């Protein structure tokens, strides 16, 4: 499998990032994961706009020609998909930009330090078996920082929450902060209450997921009522449906929450409808 690293296309085994890279030392960088179907990137513009916002917030200037709207990143992604035989079916493109290689200091390195740019691709195997029966999820305290809206590579709290889910035999861990449901370790969370779809508003408490954004549009197009407001944990437990969204999981209905059934204990009609609509959009 070939990857791109700082101007070079090379075999993954030959790709090496410096031990002084700030992404390695501090988690000082941002990333994006974009879906490709039959070689076509899905909603690449939205992903690149979110990347640009993250770079600006962190004060990382991409190399000349690599501005998110400049096209170079799309050209690299296209070449990797072709080189790796991923022009048919579903694939993922992973992109990471860090603040680059510099002496280890907590403050920013000198102006002009080249950022590290890395892209890779891989085949996507959607978890359709889990979707068919409905996922099992657990809740866990949300102990993350206050800028969850930035897609940074510093994901340790998410890693710990995901491992907690795996240990419990669950698909996902859902964060709860001060009694309010925020999002999943790697997903956004939607809840159906009294026929209306509820999801946490796009504040600094959650990542503004691209699939989340699209699902909100699909719901509105179908006349479904959507409420973007905080959902207390107690309401989550009494919801008729609960589902998750992300680039790789698409729309994932939840059948069990913390050991108890969600609604009927089977994938619900709203989640099924929105997943079918998303598949049509893909």
For each predicted feature, which ranges?
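Glycine- and Gly-Pro-enriched alpha-helical subdomains that act as flexible
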Residues: 176, 180-202, 208
């Amino acid at each position: 499998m070939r990857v791109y690293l700082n101007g070079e296309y090379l075999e993954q085994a030959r790709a090496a990032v410096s031990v002084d890279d700030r992404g390695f030392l501090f988690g000082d960088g941002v990333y994006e994961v974009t879906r490709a179907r039959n070689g076509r990137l899905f909603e690449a513009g939205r992903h690149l706009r979110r990347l640009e916002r993250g770079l600006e917030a962190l004060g990382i200037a991409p190399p000349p020609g690599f501005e998110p709207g400049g096209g170079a990143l799309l050209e690299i992604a296209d070449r990797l998909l072709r080189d790796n035989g991923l022009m048919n079916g579903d694939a993922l493109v992973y992109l990471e930009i860090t603040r680059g290689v510099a002496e280890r200091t907590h403050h920013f390195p000198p102006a002009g330090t080249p950022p590290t740019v890395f892209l890779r691709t891989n085949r996507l195997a959607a978890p359709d078996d889990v979707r068919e029966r409905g996922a099992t999820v657990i809740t866990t305290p949300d102990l993350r920082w206050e800028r969850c809206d930035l897609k940074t590579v510093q994901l340790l709290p998410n890693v710990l929450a995901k491992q907690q889910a795996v240990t419990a035999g669950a698909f996902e861990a859902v964060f709860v902060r001060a009694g309010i449901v925020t999002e999943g370790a790697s997903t956004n969370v939607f809840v159906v209450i009294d026929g209306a779809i509820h999801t946490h508003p796009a504040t600094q408490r959650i990542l503004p997921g691209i699939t989340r954004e699209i699902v909100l549009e699909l719901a509105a197009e179908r006349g479904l009522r959507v409420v973007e407001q905080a959902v207390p944990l107690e309401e989550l437990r009494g919801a008729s449906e609960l589902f998750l969204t992300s680039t790789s999981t698409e729309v994932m209905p939840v059948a069990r929450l913390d050991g108890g059934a969600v609604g009927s204990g089977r994938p619900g009609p709203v989640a099924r409808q929105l997943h079918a609509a998303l598949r049509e959009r893909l």
